């Protein structure tokens, strides 16, 4: 173990943000440069908290769907806990049995049920890296891996609608509905 705890890091960062928010001026025009950069850091921390939560929920899903067993579940959870936010590679890189890679995307569509250009580009790049490998990962050949793109869901269903616009007719991409057999030749959303 490397002594790093993602949960402890995010808990400390979040607590610093929570204490600092009350001190901000009501009008954004009165923000100092230091306050603006603190807000930017706060947004990054909140994004990391959301990504961690969604990643952990996905691992619970893998176990509940009997895609992995208890031993794999514990190994993946430990790996997630010991990986720093925004580390190179996939959000989940599991080389056990079964081999699993996953990208976790917590994008909220900027146009109600459509992603903006930068969001769309990032999602497409991640889908391609799941299919073809990623230069910033120790996994360059994804052929033997179950591949997942995990997305944040919202009450209105806008994220799902926006994702469907991207994957509609996409070769090798399928929306997981629980009624299919997972194979290594597709990316499941």
Located regions from the model:
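Interdomain/boundary linker segments immediately adjacent to catalytic/signaling cores
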Residues: 1-70, 80
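Short, well-structured alpha-helical interface segments that form or flank functional binding sites
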Residues: 49-53, 57, 85-87, 122-125, ...
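Active-site beta-strand-loop-beta-strand hairpin of nuclease catalytic cores
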Residues: 90-107
